[in-house]
Amino acid sequence: MKTKSTCAQNPNCSIMIFRPTKEEFNDFDKYIAYMESQGAHRAGLAKVIPPKEWRARQSYDNISNILIATPLQQVVSGQAGVFTQYHKKKKGMTVGEYRELANSKKYQTPPHLDFEDLERKYWKNRLYESPIYGADVSGSLFDGKTQQWNVGHLGTIQDLLEQECGIVIEGVNTPYLYFGMWKTTFAWHTEDMDLYSINYLHFGQPKTWYAVPPEHGRRLERLARELFPGSSQGCQAFLRHKVALISPTVLKENGIPFGRITQEAGEFMVTFPYGYHAGFNHGFNCAEAINFATPRWIDYGKVASQCSCGEARVSFSMDAFVRILQPERYELWKRGQDQAVVDHTETMVSTSQELTTRRVTKAPRKTWGLKRLRLRQVSRSLLPIATVSNVPCNMQVCHTSRQPSDVKGDDVQKSDSARASPHPLSLPSSGHMSTRRCSLGRRPCELGAQESSNGAPVKRQLPAGRDDTSPSPELQPQAVSGDLIVDSGLVNPGPQHLMTASEGGLTSDP
């Protein structure tokens, strides 16, 4: 049985960095619970550096022929640190062709002294030379043998969405890949249904993230309504379109607390429920992202805002989650009398030291390896798509209308032709991949765990059964100086279970 307790940890809402041991890395749910017990969720974002023995994939040498079906050119308008980003669909290209483009003179990363210098160049030159983002490629690059933290097989309660309701939404409960270049961006947003997300940077140049603590999310929304009055009038939750860019300078000037951190290859970023985040890529790279859930998320899901204009709507019924995981509140929920109240400072802790979470029995889902990835030379004929019918619960099918992604931290809008999956091509590789992210009621808009013209990409819902991807020692927090957090990993981390709290990572006016 779980009890709630107010989390007094991390009162400054600093972005934390965790280094689990090999043993601690074995239980994903338990480690997320541990991170929250230390207050990581209060920042809305945390970094996890895997044990040195762990590998997501043995080699990335054979991915050049993967097809990025609908690259998105990110065009920006605006001034003084306040921009609107929209997307122009470009002709499909392979990862190898995209790499050459990203490293070309026109799009390559400019010379810079350090991450902070590159960040200044980003905001100074964002209006020029619109970059192209290879976002929302459905699938995974994790080896099938990778058990720990394989984003396609996290085994969290989000699996109820497919198991109980037969709902599969690309990018939500199946992974998306994001191929980035210098200046490709994910605009300010929270995850669909205010879920958690996890983003792994497989290889390439770093990615800088900004995050506003969940307890200050309403302040960011109010500022965004003032800065983008037209968009605000057209949609009650227009930030879900993932097109609004607000610079750190503007946030500081308006007293909005935020943190920033740079993710490097081989590192995970975890976003927490109702944690607004945004960011940009430093150069050619590849990230993989997916959403997940814990029991603490359920009350967030009940009250999550929804896009009211249909541009970026991804929603599903909370019925199965309440019925199975909050049975004592289910009858009230059905009558509309269950008033969910979210306290962003609280965390869910177990009465036992095990931090056990109700685990849903799950049959292993087949995953798409590179052999299932869409390749340039593969036939474009389509796989049959089954209808989602006779689902064993009240969960409504996700509404799919979404803008192109800017980042998941990554997202994008998709064409109808790109929404169908091709026949598999046999390749001697492990991992799993396809080409798009699906979501009901959402159109492409974001690139990071989220990007087509005039918005971000849309998530697609797939029928279930489809062959798709899909007690810790005390820590000694270590301060990292500077607003831009760079963790070299060269210093002895001290205790095995080291967490780093970023001093100065949270910024606001006094």
From Swiss-Prot:
Query: SUPFAM superfamilies from the xrefs?
Result: Clavaminate synthase-like
Locate the compositionally biased regions of type Low complexity. Answer: 418-433
For binding 2-oxoglutarate, which residues are annotated in this chain's numbering?
Answer: 133, 199, 207, 242
Q: Where is this region: Disordered?
A: 397-510
List-wise, which residues carry PolyADP-ribosyl glutamic acid? 23-24
The record's remark on the cofactor is: Binds 1 Fe(2+) ion per subunit.
Per UniProt, what is one Pfam family of this protein?
JmjC
Family statement drawn from the similarity comment of this UniProt entry: Belongs to the JHDM3 histone demethylase family.
What name is this protein filed under? Lysine-specific demethylase 4D
Name the species this protein comes from.
Mus musculus (Mouse)
